Amino acid sequence: MYYIATGMMLVCAVLVFRILPDEKPNFTGSYAALMRSLFTLLKQYPLLRLHSVRAALAFGSFMGFWATLAFKMAQEPFHAGSDVVGMLGLCGIAGAVTASFIGKHIARLGVYRFNCFGALLQLAAWGLFAAGGNHYGPIIGGILLVDIGMQCIQLSNQAPLFELCPSAANRINTIFMSCYFIGGSLGTLLSGTAWVLFGWSGVVGTGALLTALSLIITLVAKR
């Protein structure tokens, strides 16, 4: 499997080198100045902070589920191995299918609606995980919901940020994605701790709480 992954990465590297255009940097200055400019942008644009934080919380909820799913599936009544968990991961293709639709309709339906809808889908997923966590049906249904919900939240928060300052689009994306993965790491840490202390119910509570916080931020900000 690792050899296959290595081969695929090499193919991707060649394709990226051959296909993507060579763009000249639009920032002049030292690397240290470039890094400092990230904090300047974060301070300058409140919308960047808003979008980054609520997306990070939702991603923390998302990652909290995937970080502990293998532990859950190894227990009764499943006694399943990593192969089954990998097959469940294929359900995530639902997010990839909906990504195109979401991207096309952000401007028409609005960031606020997509964030609320995505958070509600995630909360519904955690409800399924809580009520039917010992059955494949609710687990699969929850995976579909949590993945589509995450796509709604990520894309609707990320895409509008590029319009804040087109000349600094790459740096703005760096800030967003850094916050995004910090949120994912936090969710993984919290869910792992919750699993050790409280089992699956602790994971469900942690994931639902992170999503609820993301939704509350959206409702309070009203944007």
What are these regions (language model features)?
Residues 44-64, 140, 144-148:
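Pair of pore-lining "gating" transmembrane helices in MFS-fold secondary transporters
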Residues 76-94, 171-175:
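Loop-to-transmembrane helix entry
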Residues 59-78:
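Helix-loop boundary and gating motifs at the non-cytosolic
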Residues 6-26, 217-221:
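C-terminal membrane-cytosol helix-exit motif in multi-pass small-molecule transporters
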Residues 97-111, 195:
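Helix-to-loop junctions at the C-terminal end of transmembrane segments
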Residues 163-200, 204-207:
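A late C-terminal transmembrane helix in Major Facilitator Superfamily
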Residues 112-157:
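C-terminal transmembrane helical hairpin of 12-TM major facilitator-type secondary transporters
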Residues 19-53:
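Juxtamembrane intracellular "pre-TM" segments in multi-pass secondary transporters
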